[in-house]
Amino acid sequence: MPQEESRRAAVEAARTLLIEAGPQAVTLKAVAARIGRTHANLLHHFGSAAELQKALAVHLAATVCGSIGDAARAARAGIGSPREIVDLAFDAFDREGGAALATWMMLSGNEGALDPIVEAIHRLIDELHPQEQEHDAKLTMHETTQALVLLALGDALIGERLAKSLGVRRETVRERATAMLVTSYLEAGVMNPGAEP
């Protein structure tokens, strides 16, 4: 198997392990076993488990930001909705394991591995809202993105327990996030007032 194909297979296996068993399961040994390679082979490709996790973070950031970018463009065109964007963001941190991976990397002292995620989000927002890059521009969508990501991260970590404790539906946070996104879209002029939330 060519080197790039082997790396790609390892990252996909790492993503599957992350979703199935959490970030602590994403080890060179486990990924090697999953793709029928040796530990030494993966060590050659990545150098360490931390570098494998960083490659996984890059992969997650690219795929999630790609999906969110597509959903945002669809919402602008009137064939998608802000709720789809919110669901993609929340699911990336919850079901896809993004929050668990981010927390694990930070607790392991591998904070630098989060840079690809942060940078991918920044690039996406700059691409979708270039007007906010101008000097003295209002950063409506940048600020909304920060809030949306932090809501999604927090919900993935303690959302279910907190909702139960407060006696509210867990879905409430997604509804509030959608309302915030719609308000910001209207303020930024990227959505018609009559469009579907």
Residues of each region from the PLM?
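Outer-membrane beta-barrel translocator/channel fold
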Residues: 150-157
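Amphipathic alpha-helical segments used for helix-helix packing
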Residues: 87-122, 160
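Helix-turn-helix
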Residues: 9, 13, 17-51, 55
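C-terminal peripheral helix-coil segments that are non-catalytic and often amphipathic
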Residues: 123-131, 157-197
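Hydrophobic alpha-helical connector segments
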Residues: 55, 66-99, 134, 141, ...
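Short, Lys/Arg-enriched anionic-surface-contact patches
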Residues: 1-6
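Amphipathic alpha-helical packing segments from all-alpha helical-bundle domains
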Residues: 64-68, 106-146
